[in-house]
């Protein structure tokens, strides 16, 4: 498969296709990177960075809006996740990292994947406990992966999110999600009780 070179933005989070991510760009190397991406209408790669280094699989991102620019070159932007990729090699020729990557496609049709029994009910319960409302109805025609949408929406452990992003089969992703959501319920119940005790009625801080 053909390799392409893209800039890398290591972050302590996982970006999914179709997800919107606000970013504050302040480091000189990333100000340069974002400016070059905007000027050339090109994408960069968001990759999970942790104590063990960077992950092998990430998601390309496209700048959709520059919401604020500062005199010193800092900027607030919004990006949208596009496509998963796998790093083949990292290149250090510029102030920021680049990588030769191959784009990843699902091995099966995500839209036709079977939804595990109980998954939507557990998802709705988590959402109500955490945010005080039912989740929005999922549009499977415009957003291919229900698993990506759920994993993006809820405060799952970042390693769990990375596991979902790395899978190339929607049936596998959905099957993996169900125990993750069941494990989230106790945490969601604690946050719900804290919100009730504080008298809040808005979104919980996650």
Regions found by a protein language model. Give the residues of each.
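N-terminal low-complexity, acidic/polar interaction/targeting segments
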Residues: 1-206
């Amino acid at each position: 498969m053909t390799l392409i070179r893209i800039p890398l933005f290591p972050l302590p989070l996982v970006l999914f296709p179709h997800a919107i991510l606000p970013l504050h760009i302040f480091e000189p190397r990333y100000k340069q990177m974002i400016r070059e991406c905007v000027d050339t209408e090109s994408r960069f790669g968001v990759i999970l960075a942790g104590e063990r280094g960077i992950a092998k699989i990430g998601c390309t991102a496209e700048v959709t809006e520059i919401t604020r620019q500062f005199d010193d070159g800092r900027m607030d932007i919004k990006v949208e996740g596009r496509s998963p990729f796998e790093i083949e090699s990292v290149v250090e020729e510029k102030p920021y990292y680049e990588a030769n990557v191959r784009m990843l496609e699902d091995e099966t049709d995500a839209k036709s994947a079977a939804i595990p029994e109980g998954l939507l009910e557990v998802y709705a319960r988590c959402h109500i406990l955490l945010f005080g409302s039912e989740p929005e109805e999922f549009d499977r025609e415009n957003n291919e992966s229900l698993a990506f949408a759920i994993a993006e929406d809820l405060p799952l452990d970042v390693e769990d999110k990375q596991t979902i992003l790395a899978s190339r089969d929607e049936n596998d992703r959905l099957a993996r999600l169900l125990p993750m959501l069941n494990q989230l319920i106790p945490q969601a119940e604690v946050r719900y009780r804290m919100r009730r005790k504080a008298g809040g009625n808005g979104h919980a801080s996650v």
